[in-house]
Amino acid sequence: MNIPFSPPHIDDAIIEEVVSALRSGWITTGPRTKLFEQKLAEYCGIQHVECVNSASAGMELALRWFGIGPDDEVIVPAYTYTATAEVVLHCGAKLVLVDVNDDLLIDVDKVRQAITPKTKVIIPVDIVGLPCDYQEILDLVNEPEIRKLFRPANDCQSTLGRILILADAAHSLGAYYQGKHTGAVADISVFSFHAVKNLTTAEGGAICLNLPETFHSESIKKDFNTLSLHGQTKDAFTKTKAGAWRYDVCTIGYKCNMTDVAAAMGLVELARYDQNILPKRKRIFDAYNQAFANDPRFRVPTYVTPTKQSSYHVFTLRVNHITEEQRDLIIVKMAENGVAANVHFIPLPMLTAYKSLGFNIQDYPNAYRQYACEISLPVYYDLSDEQVNEVIRVLKAAVSEVL
């Protein structure tokens, strides 16, 4: 039996909708993208969503919109994928890494210690689908002493009057925090629809706007739309209307719009997300939890609490009392027996690009401790009960062999 890690589910409904988009004669940003944005906004319980070609692009656009650049500081957890940090560096800002808790989420006490008058943005990461402690983070940035530290440099920053909370929600579509969907909690949240995500458009992302009422949400959406299309005031679909060919370029923008072909996939996936996709993933999580929770060799991830519900994106199992080398050997032995496993993620200070910036993993001990014993197990739509049982059997056998 060969069990991959996370292949996408592509069925006839998706193929038919994509073919329909292709046959329509409109394959770039158009009516399907607009409809997908509308449906996502309704799903999250917010007013406006702007779809883009990746979560990375969405996060960078958010930073650019907020005016982030040299002399600014942005706080990011050390335990995340490189995309979260790269967007900060692309803007020329100083990247400030902080450690995480045992649940892999950003340590708010470490965030507090890292805030300076130059801090403009905090990027919490809903790692593997579990929402961060947003109320604690929002309470922190709204503390009078923290607000006094904030030094606005433009109109957006002055209007907000505090540090921006930009959620890297790449993993957490469908998760809940205090009864609200992710996307409706932080000031701005960005989802990913990459091929391995719960909901995929092959490549894609979405910017969810949940800014205070002092901002005009519809106007901000237009700002993001303009930034995503070279700073142009009209997209290609709008220019097809009679007499509407003339446009302006009002700012120096980027090219990161979503296509209607991608949105076609997203519309099919979103329509069945809560009733079909999430329940299947939860069933797999529950099976793994039942198999490992009472075995002292393992520590299962938190995926439901009184205030949080995960999106069931990745099952991050920890194996107790092992070294990084033993963990790697377990993954090799699983592969030799037909089961693909992974690690989420290598902490940023362990990667060459970040070492060269002066980061040292010794400064982030908990990020390393969690990484060194973590194994991510297969979770995907078409994974059968038989295959889940095989993953469990193979992993337990590999651990017994290594230990």
Regions found by a protein language model. Give the residues of each.
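Conserved active-site segment immediately N-terminal to the catalytic lysine
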Residues: C156-T200, W245-C250, R299
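Short beta-strand-to-turn element immediately C-terminal to the catalytic PLP-Schiff-base lysine
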Residues: F191-S192, G205-T214, L267
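Hydrophobic/aromatic ligand-binding patch that stacks against planar heteroaromatic rings
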Residues: E86-V88, H181, V261
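PLP-dependent aminotransferase class I/II
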Residues: K34-Q38, I46-Q47, V121-V125, L130-L138, ...
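Phosphate-binding glycine-rich loop
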Residues: W26-E73, V87-C91, L97, I146-L149
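N-terminal "arm"/small-domain region of PLP-dependent enzymes with the aminotransferase-like
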Residues: M1-I27, P31, D248-C250, P378
